[in-house]
Amino acid sequence: METEKMVAEKWLIAIGASGAAGLRDIGALLSTLPADLDAAVLVVLHRPSDKPSFLREVLARRSRMPVFIAEQSEILRPGRAYIGEPAAHLSLFRTNVSALITHDASTHRNRTVDLLFESLANIGGEKIIGVVLSGSLDDGSRGLASIHKANGHTMALEPDREHAQYVGMPENAIRFNGPVDFIGSVATIADEIVKLVSTRANVAIEAV
């Protein structure tokens, strides 16, 4: 049986985006990350809460790792991607990182990415990664800064000037108070994630 300490030592990757462009980016990222990545991936995408959602099915067709709808108090497993229902946002218990919980999002409209990122920041440490992909407005900026302050790793998509309506989220994250560690394309972000996770894993093995 996994203890809280064992789960806390695992990598957690949180990805936030919005709209069709954000969905495209998330699909591209999950299609690049390896199936055996030693990290749990949490995904938040702004989308209507009053319409049927096929996000899991859409992402599962592209993802190399299995995609699940997050359940209340679910233990996070590496090599899996988790999404929330449209009318909820995802966060983690500060005192028990093994539990994934959902909240009513009605009072947190357009702040679901910040809420997820900030819950990871409450855990803190070098094994948390926050990623902001395409989307409008500025959700994710504050949360990404919180992850940076908590010694986690922060990444943002390089804003695409040809699609200016979709650059708000990454552009605001880059400009916000709290430097972004890595800025690049979806492909280079995937490479950086794999490098971070594998490098830290090798260091841990050598230290044993």
Task: Go through each PLM region and give its residues.
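Conserved acid/base catalytic micro-environments in cytosolic active-site loops
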Residues: 1-208
